[in-house]
Amino acid sequence: ALLAQNPYGLDFGERVAFLGASHPIHSVTADRSEFIGRHGTTEYPQAVLGGLALSGRIEAGDDPCAVVASDIDIPAGGDVTLSWLLGDAATPAEASALVQTHRGKDFDQRLADNEKAWRGFLDTIQVETPD
């Protein structure tokens, strides 16, 4: 997974953002110009169109972004399910643990678990008011 932190952010400077996947990630970059390319656009990034491996460059400054790349083989007549994991954690260790936990779960199971967690949170307070 690709982890990022902005210590200069006033509200969330201590937090760690992450981008991971349910499948192996083969290369990453945090350099927007590498991904988009000199004459590319966000709709047609040169790294994707050229099938290029990303450099692994992760540095502060410039124009950052988060890009992870994977090579996926789809068999003729087949299908492949891919899940992208985008989140936030208190520490890098917690971010890595979240990615590991959710990487191994089936998407439908993750969705059901998420709905159950939100229901538990949202259903705790019920307010009734007179008309």
Regions picked out by a protein language model, each given a short descriptive name:
Residues 1-76:
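Trp/Gly-enriched beta-strand surface patches
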Residues 5, 46, 100, 109, ...:
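Residue-identity detector for glutamine
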Residues 88-111:
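Terminal amphipathic helices with adjacent charged low-complexity linkers/tails
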Residues 104-131:
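An acidic-aromatic substrate-binding cleft motif
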Residues 72-90:
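Short Pro-Gly-centered flexible turn/kink motifs
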Residues 9, 42, 80, 92, ...:
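A generic structural micro-environment signature
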Residues 12-13, 27-29, 82-84, 91-96:
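Short helix/loop capping segments that flank catalytic or ligand/cofactor-binding pockets
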